[in-house]
């Protein structure tokens, strides 16, 4: 059984929890099953890139983006394109550059025998269609400005 701690009054809004084993196709199929099992489903939250994008693909294929909100964790070029086309309403993005910088900095301190922090929260950012092209968010989504197209997302 999964834990619902920290959700407060929202815990009863969760109708199911499924695991895709970090596989896009499995997430896609599980999402199709959830949409069939729960015809009044209002939202799907994916907790990593695979579950998020797989779910978004299934919602898009079912043309259910106006009925089911999709939010996720982690970003990719495909996730950004799915957000541009109204499939994702939000994605939580890690601050990877800061994570790497702080990780190296603390490792150097450790190797020098200096005091270092063992646990550091490098932060994350909620990205939405409204803020995705602000300067700060673009740096998180496109750190090296490489963009690959993932098929025709308009159909």
What are these regions (language model features)?
Residues 1-2:
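Short, small-residue-biased leader/transition segments that mark boundaries at the very start
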Residues 5, 10-11, 65:
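Conserved H-loop
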Residues 6, 33-37, 58-62, 82, ...:
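Structured segments of extracytoplasmic/periplasmic soluble domains
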Residues 6-7, 95-155:
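Hinge/cleft segment of the Venus flytrap/periplasmic-binding protein
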Residues 14-17, 70, 91, 126:
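Conserved beta-strand scaffold positions in the cores of enzyme catalytic domains, especially
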Residues 16-81:
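Hydrophobic alpha-helical
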Residues 54, 82, 102, 106:
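Alpha-helical scaffold segments in soluble metabolic enzymes
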Residues 85-97:
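Short beta-strand elements at the ligand-binding edges of bilobed clamshell
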């Amino acid at each position: 059984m999964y834990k619902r701690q920290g959700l407060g009054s929202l815990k009863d809004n969760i109708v199911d929890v499924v695991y895709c084993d970090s596989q896009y196709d499995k997430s896609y199929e599980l999402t199709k099953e959830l949409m069939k099992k729960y015809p009044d489903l209002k939202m799907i939250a994916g907790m990593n890139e695979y579950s998020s994008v797989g779910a978004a693909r299934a919602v898009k294929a079912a043309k259910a983006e106006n009925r089911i909100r999709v939010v996720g964790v982690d970003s990719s070029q495909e996730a950004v394109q799915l957000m541009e086309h109204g499939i994702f309403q939000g994605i939580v993005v890690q601050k990877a550059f800061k994570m790497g910088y702080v990780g190296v900095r603390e490792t150097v301190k450790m190797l020098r025998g200096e005091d270092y922090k063992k646990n550091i929260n490098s932060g994350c950012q909620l990205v939405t269609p409204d803020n995705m092209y602000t300067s700060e968010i673009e740096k998180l989504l496109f750190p090296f400005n490489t963009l690959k197209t993932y098929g025709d997302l308009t159909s």
